[in-house]
Amino acid sequence: MKKEETMNIVCSTDDNYVPLCGIMLTSLFENNKGHYISVYILTEGISSQNRSLLKNITQRRDYNGEIHLCVVKDNRFNYCPIRSGDHVSVAAYYRFLIPELLPQNIDKALYLDCDIIVNGSLSDLYGTDMSNVCIAACAEHTGDSYTLRVSEENINRLGYPKEWGYFNSGVMLLNLTYWRQKKVTDDLFAYVMRNHDKCLFHDQDTLNAVLGNKKKFIPYKYNFMTVLFTDGNEKRINPVILQERPIIIHYCTAVKPWEWYLVDYPFKKQWEHYRKMSLWKKWRGNKPWPERLKRVLIALLYKMKGKDVIFYDKSWKRLTKME
């Protein structure tokens, strides 16, 4: 990727997630100062105060870029299933509209979830050759037997060939030209309407099923999922993925680093670093006090039993040296 090339970044948020979005964007700008960055934030609507805060990110530290807010309103989302107890909202499906919402002269964009920290340059990732593919993303599995089995279960449920693979939709490089030419957005909504019972993982299932073999898999360092370090996973880690410094850290577990009562957490130091650097340095999460207290007590019980909410082993210690 040439330095003068604009890097187009897309994310989505509501008022509740604005702090996470802002902290993620701070880490993005801080680690990619050599490029002009245009950020497009998809939202159903946020307060004027939050709108101003997000817009001020680029001005505060003289970052080289701009932030646009794209209001999403589309009746097709009425057909997108959100079940009782799901930990996502209909906003998970907003990424279906990225090629329509972004200016038509933009041919490539990188989508990032908000529970992410950018820990290095995205230049090589953004320069990925996208010839004849729609999306470049990281495999949901990490090459070990457990996550490979889970991915195969997803593929079997969706009913497509295993060789097409299954990716995580938290980080996606999008070929918008291909997407528009092949009318992928129409195919995605049509699939959801016909197969809502199959889409256990919402937009991620839909994207994997519809895109078929038009996906390209990228190194795991571009979507390093902290779920690897949760209790019980210590024997599942594939040593291969620990050989490179994580560039994008994805905090994709139920327990998050911004839940202040945890003494430690994989890559919490990075998240705290960018929180303190951001306009949300005093933010400590949205959970009400009763819920915070409940989680503190659970953590204390684990400690009393000689256990940790998050496990640490030699693999984790190796990674901390690459932080």
Predicted regions located by residue number:
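A short, conserved beta-to-alpha structural element at the edge of catalytic cores
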Residues: A136-L158, V263-F267
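A recurrent flexible, glycine/aromatic-enriched loop bordering the glycosyltransferase active site
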Residues: G159-V171
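Short loop->beta transition adjacent to catalytic acidic/histidine clusters or analogous donor-positioning motifs
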Residues: N32-Y40, I67
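A glycosyltransferase accessory/donor-loop signature
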Residues: K2-T6, T13, L176-E323
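N-proximal low-complexity "stem/linker" segments adjacent to membrane-targeting elements
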Residues: M1-E30
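GT-A fold catalytic core of metal-dependent nucleotide-sugar glycosyltransferases
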Residues: N75, A91-Y146, Y166, L173-L174
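Active-site-proximal specificity loops/subdomain of glycosyltransferases
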Residues: N56-E100
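Short internal beta-strands
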Residues: S38-G45, A137-A139
